[in-house]
């Protein structure tokens, strides 16, 4: 094999191989931490300057009737030759209005020099901004947003030998940022295994790469080399103090986790799992267990924390109104136009408390989601659910409706529930968990209609959204979400529809478990949101 062919195959392996991120805290002294925070703020300002420039060009482009007409024609055309011609015209217009990656990249060079940012960090920030512009140009994005004061963007170098280079010293990983040198805190067995794997690769990288290329040629699969790809520094404000975390992107799948006795921490089950994921709850049915629980709930204090968030926010609003009465109309609405705002010390303290509480709640939500995903993976290896629809449910209603009393109905829908419970985040985590661990993740089509089918009548019967507990045609009382999960559990691979024979044979066994579950929920006074189960 020639050197050119080897490099080509190695590049192909890098494209096909998996990636994962190791998150560890750095051991920087606090003065160095503040320097990292200052650099992060400079990157934020430089990014905002580039966002302003790209937004201006994008707005000018979208104002032209010709471009809007071409977009409409492109969306309505099916002929490939016409699509190609329209795409070329759209690209030409984007070039003429400087809405291109090349313009974005070259514009960032003088901005980066102005703020004294390394070229590699400036280029990475430009890539992030262009990714946002691409969402506006080719996806459902509306506008690119500025980073607020206090938000600290990550400091990322897309190459391991530039920006934040890595080296080995006394058998430990060390990193460098400008004149600062620092290491990392390795706190547990998983982090230790990951670091040892990276060190093992760095001892003989050429041999590991050669083994990976040979395996790709002979077996057409990718092995885990644990090559360090690049490092990212992420500053965070935790309990009033800044801390810097290192995100090391590593080639290959993550190492398995073990408990203190050396046993695998997570067990992987076998069998089918049907799950109905709502805005606030998840109901599931498996071969061994049925369940109905609130999403993103870790302990009993989640609802108390959510209420505290609201109370802090209201207190901040009262303080803001008291110190800035000139910015409000007599009816309490905010005046239009440019305004100056003054914030009291009391407001600043409340804001810090609110931010810290939001951070803690976000961490707890993420931990709860991971725990629930691991529990589901221990029950089976095939996960069947409906497609995600949280983004649609989050939006306000378009139609203005009037109730029986002649008052306008509120247009708000499920935005607050989705923010607090993260159903899409949970579904994405479950999807990754099952796919990475050798399981299967299946999303049924929209005509599956698990919430409408009644297996006792063999018919689809529409129900009101408020009917959380209802009776089947034969008189059996079922909980709506659980019954939907049962119908998803009865998924047929061949027809990709409900297996009616399985519904009949397995319903009695699963229904007994559902009755026992509801009795347990009532006995333990557990409040399941929007379930219809009344707890005394």
Per-range role (PLM):
Residues 66-76, 145-163, 507-523, 527:
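Amphipathic alpha-helical surface "interface" segments used
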Residues 244-536:
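Positively charged, helix-rich recognition surfaces that bind polyanionic ligands
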Residues 16-30, 182-197, 293-295:
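Generic detection of short hydrophobic beta-strand segments and adjacent strand-loop junctions
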Residues 12, 230-236, 254-264:
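Catalytic micro-motifs at enzyme active sites that drive phosphoryl/nucleotidyl and oxygen chemistry
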Residues 50, 124-136, 482-492:
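Stable alpha-helical structural segments in soluble proteins, enriched in small hydrophobic residues
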Residues 43, 90, 126-133, 350, ...:
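Short amphipathic alpha-helical coiled-coil/interface segments
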Residues 1-123:
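Gly/serine-rich nucleotide phosphate-binding loop at the start of the catalytic core
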Residues 77-240, 415-416, 420:
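Acidic carboxylate diad motif detector
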């Amino acid at each position: 094999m020639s050197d050119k062919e080897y490099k080509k195959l190695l590049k192909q392996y890098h494209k096909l191989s998996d990636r994962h991120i190791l998150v560890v805290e750095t051991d920087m002294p606090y003065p160095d931490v503040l320097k990292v925070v200052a650099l992060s703020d400079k990157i934020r300002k430089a990014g905002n300057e580039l966002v302003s420039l790209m937004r201006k060009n994008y707005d000018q482009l979208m104002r032209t009737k010709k471009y809007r007409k071409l977009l409409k024609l492109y969306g309505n055309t099916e002929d490939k030759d016409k699509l190609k011609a329209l795409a070329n015209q759209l690209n030409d217009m984007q070039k003429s209005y400087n809405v291109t990656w090349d313009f974005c990249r070259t514009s960032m060079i003088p901005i980066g020099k102005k703020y004294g940012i390394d070229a590699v960090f400036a280029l990475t920030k430009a890539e992030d901004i262009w990714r946002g512009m691409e969402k506006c140009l080719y996806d459902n994005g509306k506008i690119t947003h500025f980073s607020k004061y206090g938000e600290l963007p990550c400091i990322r170098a897309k190459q391991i030998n530039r920006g934040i280079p890595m080296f080995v010293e006394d058998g430990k990983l060390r990193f460098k940022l400008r004149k600062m040198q620092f290491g990392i805190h390795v706190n547990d067995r998983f982090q230790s295994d990951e670091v040892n794997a990276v060190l093992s690769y760095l001892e003989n990288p050429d041999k590991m790469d050669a083994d990976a290329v040979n395996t790709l040629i002979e077996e057409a699969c990718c092995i885990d080399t644990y090559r360090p790809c690049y490092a990212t520094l992420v500053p965070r404000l935790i309990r009033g103090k800044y801390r810097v975390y290192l995100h090391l992107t590593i080639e290959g799948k993550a190492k398995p986790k073990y408990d203190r006795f050396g046993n695998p921490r997570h067990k992987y089950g076998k069998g089918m799992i049907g799950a109905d994921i709502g805005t606030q709850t998840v109901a599931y049915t498996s071969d061994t267990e049925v369940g109905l629980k609130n999403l993103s709930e870790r302990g009993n204090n989640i609802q108390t924390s959510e209420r505290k968030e609201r109370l802090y926010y209201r207190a901040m609003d009262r303080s803001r109104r008291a110190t800035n009465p000139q910015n409000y109309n007599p009816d309490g609405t905010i005046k239009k136009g440019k305004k100056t705002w003054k914030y009291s010390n009391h407001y600043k303290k409340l804001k810090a408390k609110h931010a810290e509480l939001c951070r803690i709640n976000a961490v707890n939500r993420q931990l709860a989601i991971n725990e629930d995903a691991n529990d589901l993976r221990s029950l089976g290896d095939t996960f069947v659910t409906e497609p995600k629809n949280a983004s649609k449910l989050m939006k306000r209603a378009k139609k203005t409706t009037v109730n029986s009393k002649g008052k306008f109905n509120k247009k708000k829908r499920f935005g607050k529930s989705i923010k607090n419970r993260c159903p899409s985040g949970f579904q994405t985590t479950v999807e990754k968990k099952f796919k990475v661990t050798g399981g299967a993740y299946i999303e049924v089509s929209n005509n599956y209609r698990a919430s409408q089918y009644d297996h006792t009548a063999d018919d689809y019967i529409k129900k009101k959204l408020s009917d959380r507990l209802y009776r089947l045609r034969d008189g059996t009382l079922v909980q709506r979400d659980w019954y939907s999960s049962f119908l998803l559990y009865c998924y047929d691979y061949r027809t990709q529809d409900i297996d009616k024979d399985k519904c009949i044979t397995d319903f009695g066994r699963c229904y007994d478990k559902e009755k026992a579950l509801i009795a347990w929920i009532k006995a333990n006074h557990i409040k399941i949101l929007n379930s219809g189960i009344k707890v005394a």
